[in-house]
Amino acid sequence: MTAQMHEAGRTKEAGNRLQAWRTGIDTYQEPVVYMRRDCPVCRSEGFTTQARVQLTAGGRSIVATLSVVDGDWLAENVAGLSESAWASLGAQPGEPVAVTHAPPLDSLSHVRAKVYGNSLGDAQFGAIISDVAAGRYSDLHLATFITACAGDRLDLAETLSLTKAMIAVGDRIDWGRPLVVDKHCVGGLPGNRTTLLVVPIVTACGLMMPKTSSRAITSPAGTADTMEVLAPVNLDVPSMRRVVERTGGCIVWGGSVRLSPADDILIRVERPLDLDSEGQLVASVLSKKAAAGSTHVLIDLPVGATAKVRSAHAAASLGRRLQEVGGAIGLQVFLRVTDGEQPVGRGIGPALEARDVLAVLQGTREAPADLRERALRLAADILEMGGAAPAGGGLKLATEVLADGRAWAKFQAICSEQGGLRSLPMAAHLHTVESPGTGRVTRIDNRLLARAAKLAGAPTAPAAGIDVHARLGDRVEAGQPLFTLHAQAPGELAYALEFVRARPPIFQISENV
Amino acid sequence: MTAQMHEAGRTKEAGNRLQAWRTGIDTYQEPVVYMRRDCPVCRSEGFTTQARVQLTAGGRSIVATLSVVDGDWLAENVAGLSESAWASLGAQPGEPVAVTHAPPLDSLSHVRAKVYGNSLGDAQFGAIISDVAAGRYSDLHLATFITACAGDRLDLAETLSLTKAMIAVGDRIDWGRPLVVDKHCVGGLPGNRTTLLVVPIVTACGLMMPKTSSRAITSPAGTADTMEVLAPVNLDVPSMRRVVERTGGCIVWGGSVRLSPADDILIRVERPLDLDSEGQLVASVLSKKAAAGSTHVLIDLPVGATAKVRSAHAAASLGRRLQEVGGAIGLQVFLRVTDGEQPVGRGIGPALEARDVLAVLQGTREAPADLRERALRLAADILEMGGAAPAGGGLKLATEVLADGRAWAKFQAICSEQGGLRSLPMAAHLHTVESPGTGRVTRIDNRLLARAAKLAGAPTAPAAGIDVHARLGDRVEAGQPLFTLHAQAPGELAYALEFVRARPPIFQISENV
């Protein structure tokens, strides 16, 4: 060791401490640290912007991306933390923070190999997912990994490796029962909020269904977003366990129970990129089901020209992949292919979808028949798969339980255990788009509809979204309402409307049909 | 239009103005705007973190990524701009800034199509590159595009479309001459700094060679980084033109002449990701050569097990692609495959490489013979391809011009015109790694060597890098120096040394050879 190395060693011990300071900057989920260019740490360590640094305070370490600052608002002796860095480091204001180079990320070489078209195995996916779950990947690294696995770039063996790696970094709930049912919808269909109906129906029939749901990734509302309008969903595992023990079921946000820490991190980049991947979808869904302690899982696969799954062929291929990987990790996977040609129910967006759900549960005149029928079909499958109804007898039982109010009572009990049933918020800014001509509705573009609902503010603004007034095959007159945009802020209403006006018509009205 | 829409229109006119404020936050090149969560714009427009927003001041507009802030250091009525947002918006402190939703980025659907494995055509690449050049892509979008095109995912037609799209968004210099020569090295070989020798040799023989070079993307030094140690390289087009008119050549940074605005933006994400793509490499190189007004281009393709091009087969494939695309856009492309088994010269890193270049130009005893020979070979090719020497006579002419001092005089003239020859900086913190045993050097891992040089601070710290003391085939004794790490900061020296110690040996010493 040379004289310089001894000096370097000393620097490492003493010279690299700053004081923790909360900047209040929301960088979404990527941890960022702000340090003055002329602070002692940047000078001695040679740090520049975009460097990945390790922050250590009170024995806890995180990796963050550095932004160097020239500006008096940041003191020379502080490490300014973004909100996510502040939360994950858990430091006290003014507490000493040691700042060092982040350890080299060797698993990135596997990501690079995947980008270049090579196949990865258990060890490589294990290394990548373990680094992802530990927060060692920057958003750029995550974007590269997700893109490299997107489309159909993961084969069966790779999808299984990824699934196992994602299960390995999380916890797994043991319910002490031989049969725990679950469902998942592959999505892409606005308003398809059947979970909020299926869970109360099947738990009212004695099955156990501890449902963890996701927030929206690329859609205007995830099931967790919609449920949150009606009851708290940010439960931890002990609270979730209490709700399930008392009611047989729950509908909580999977991110708060943190059963799939890697998945929660990947989702933060999938959302702004609006990318899906078959392999990642399978790994994400099945690792969460395994972690939640499920044994029997029904997968709803809506198929339609503008849904996520666009053909019966694609549904069969995805379904087979789900069953193969499920079998390899000890999950029995059942499939139900459903019609995905148009939105389900009337509302798109958290509050508008929740309103439809309540109407079905309460059997009111406004209850959308399609949402009710889809939920009954899926509940019937689960009742039969779980042995609560004889083969072919599921639909009759599900229909009775919904009609006689047992499902509504069960839903209220679940909401109450999760923290209390809430009343629905309403949007203040509305605009109705009318039919330009007279004719029949021959096509509805789900993707444009979902994008317009997102531009109107959904799901961040829970009352925002779209109310759909016409369905496929309906006859409409010129000037008749097709759909209404709901927004909580005037700027968002204007933005969504501008989008709708600039695109091809979302509803195709044909005169001679 | 409803009452709400009129209200939205009014808000858009008046309510969305904040005052420009320079935060001094360096976010590398991504423009970021910091706004208080409770500011009037966030409240009226419903903006949340990660939103892409359009900022307009004095008729100039940019798109930036929003970070929402809860914190008193940022005033309620300001739009806090990152350094890159501040520079590109060009606002005055306190100037009103209008903040609106960024227009929807329709070209992202093409990126998504490419991610899912579809081929893109002229129109799609044109739309993507035009949005990239206009700064409408976030770093996450750029990472997705780059990953989707990485490896060999672009076919010939797509590579040509991308090249044409990149040329279309930039300027093209017209030198008014039928023959303008250029060279490019595909890279991956530390220390291969032949450009600084080739330009003075061939311009001393009367050819015109206006060389724009890049900064390091994934290497410890780019040609522009090395040249910058010796003379200013941040010239604009008129200054570059003046240098070339007076001396016949130049060596400037391509990013400052801004001939390839899209390429300059893509590189900002390629660097942290350490990703290369054949299609993007071809498009990047050839679009820059076309923009610089070159007509005849020599491509140096170093081949070696740990170089960027690893086999003669890969070199032939890449070379063919460069010639095909070059031909289609009117560039004559010549190839020279060179040995890429070990670093060139002794130094790795801007200042250490510049020192080697000066030794060759001045013919001193320390001049690395391999660097000298490689440069003479390439200069000879260019002299013949440009008609300054008869076929087979290039090497003799190049050798004479270097030996008699004309090349050194020309290099000084070019440096002087670019702003003056500078003296070399030296690193303060050194550590020499010695051979663990006695034997012959049978393998040198260029990739690990380059990574260690980067961890030591190169190229951001110009004096940082590695001095290599042994070459392939050399016999070394135990304890004999193999290489010396140079760093400007003690932390960086420690970090690089830690890396070297944790990896397999960079130099393989075999006893029985």
UniProtKB/Swiss-Prot annotation, chains A, B:
Gene Ontology MF terms in the entry: 1,4-alpha-oligoglucan phosphorylase activity; thymidine phosphorylase activity
Q: Which domain of life is it from?
A: Bacteria
Gene3D superfamilies given in the database record: 1.20.970.50, Nucleoside phosphorylase/phosphoribosyltransferase catalytic domain, Pyrimidine nucleoside phosphorylase-like, C-terminal domain
Q: Which SUPFAM superfamilies match?
A: Nucleoside phosphorylase/phosphoribosyltransferase catalytic domain, Nucleoside phosphorylase/phosphoribosyltransferase N-terminal domain, Pyrimidine nucleoside phosphorylase C-terminal domain
Print the keywords alphabetically. Answer: Glycosyltransferase, Transferase
Which InterPro entries does UniProt cross-reference here?
Glycosyl_Trfase_fam3 (IPR000312), Glycosyl_Trfase_fam3_N_dom (IPR017459), Glycosyl_Trfase_fam3_N_dom_sf (IPR036320), Nuc_phospho_transferase (IPR035902), PYNP-like_C_sf (IPR036566), PYNP_C (IPR013102), Pyrmidine_PPase_CS (IPR017872), Thym_Pase_Put (IPR028579)
The reply on keyword Transferase is yes
Range of residues in the leader sequence:
none
| Top enzyme class | transferase
> Cellular component terms, GO, for this chain's entry?
cytosol
Reactions catalysed, as given in the entry: thymidine + phosphate = 2-deoxy-alpha-D-ribose 1-phosphate + thymine
Q: Which BP terms does GO give this entry?
A: pyrimidine nucleobase metabolic process; pyrimidine nucleoside metabolic process
- Give the EC number(s) listed in the UniProt record: 2.4.2.4
Transmembrane portions of the chain:
none
PANTHER family assigned to the protein according to its UniProt record, in alphabetical order: THYMIDINE PHOSPHORYLASE
Give the similarity note.
Belongs to the thymidine/pyrimidine-nucleoside phosphorylase family. Type 2 subfamily.
HAMAP family, sorted? Thymid_phosp_2 (MF_00703)
What is this protein's record name? Answer: Putative thymidine phosphorylase 2
Query: What organism does the UniProt record list as the source?
Result: Acidovorax sp. (strain JS42)
Organism taxonomic ancestry: Bacteria, Pseudomonadati, Pseudomonadota, Betaproteobacteria, Burkholderiales
